[in-house]
Amino acid sequence: MAKIQITLTRSIIGRPETQRKTVKALGLTKMHSSVEVEDNPAIRGQINKVSHLVTVKEL
């Protein structure tokens, strides 16, 4: 499968707990931190929940 790079571009301060947990589950901890993960439906679902906080780049 393809890999995607996810970057946290907006802060989680003041966001609901569910969004904070989703960002943490994606492996993002600090602003502008990035992770490379396999592209699968589970990851895409998590990205959709916090799409306003992250940017996604296909590798």
Curated annotation (Swiss-Prot):
The record's InterPro entries line, in alphabetical order, gives: Ribo_uL30_ferredoxin-like_sf, Ribosomal_uL30_bac-type, Ribosomal_uL30_ferredoxin-like
Q: What is a single cellular component term in the Gene Ontology annotation? A: cytosolic large ribosomal subunit
CDD domains with a match to the protein in the record:
Ribosomal_L30 (cd01658)
Molecular function terms from GO? structural constituent of ribosome
Q: Pfam families from the xrefs?
A: Ribosomal_L30 (PF00327)
* Gene Ontology BP term (one): translation
* Keyword vocabulary terms for this entry: Ribonucleoprotein, Ribosomal protein
Q: Which PANTHER family match?
A: LARGE RIBOSOMAL SUBUNIT PROTEIN UL30M (PTHR15892:SF2), MITOCHONDRIAL RIBOSOMAL PROTEIN L30 (PTHR15892)
Q: Which family does it belong to?
A: Belongs to the universal ribosomal protein uL30 family.
**Per its UniProt record, what NCBIfam families does this chain match?**
rpmD_bact
Spell out the subunit comment: Part of the 50S ribosomal subunit.
Q: What is this protein called?
A: Large ribosomal subunit protein uL30
